[in-house]
Amino acid sequence: MNQAIHVNSKNLSGPGHWSDMDMMEVGNPGMTVTEQASHFAIWAMFKSTLMISTSIPAANSDTVAILQNRDLIAISQDEAGLPVSLVQRFTNDRDVYAGDLANGDKAVLLLDLSNITR
C-alpha cells in the first residue's frame, strides 16, 4: 500500500477516467482494522475504483462499517473526479494530501505510514 500512494495520478484521472490502484484488501487477512480503514480512505481519496475483493457474506462488522463509509464513498464518487495530491511531507512517514471537490470543498487525507501505533 505504501508504494501505491506515491504514484502521481493527478493527471491520470478525472471525470470519466479513474485510477486503478489494484484490488482493495479491506476484509482480507493481513491488516489491522485501522490499516484497513486507511487503505479504504486512500483508495477513495485517490479516486481508484472501490472494487471489493473480500467475501461479503463472511465479512465481519468492522469490514462492513469500513466498506459502508458514506463520506469516503461520496468523495470517491465526486463528480470532479480529481484525486488528492501530496501537499506536505512532515517526516519520511507522515504525509498530508488534499484535493478539490466539485462543490468547492477540499478532501484532506492525513497519513502516518510508520509501523508504530501512536
What is each stretch, according to the model?
Residues 6-7, 25, 33-34, 56, ...:
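Short amphipathic alpha-helical surface micro-motifs
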Residues 38-90:
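Catalytic cores of secreted or luminal carbohydrate-active enzymes
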Residues 15-17, 28, 82, 100, ...:
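Intrinsically disordered, low-complexity regions
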Residues 43-46, 51-53, 89-118:
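Carbohydrate-binding surface patches
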Residues 1-55:
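Glycan-recognition surfaces
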Residues 1, 10, 15-16, 22-24, ...:
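Extracellular low-complexity, O-glycosylation-prone Ser/Thr/Pro/Gly-rich "stalks"
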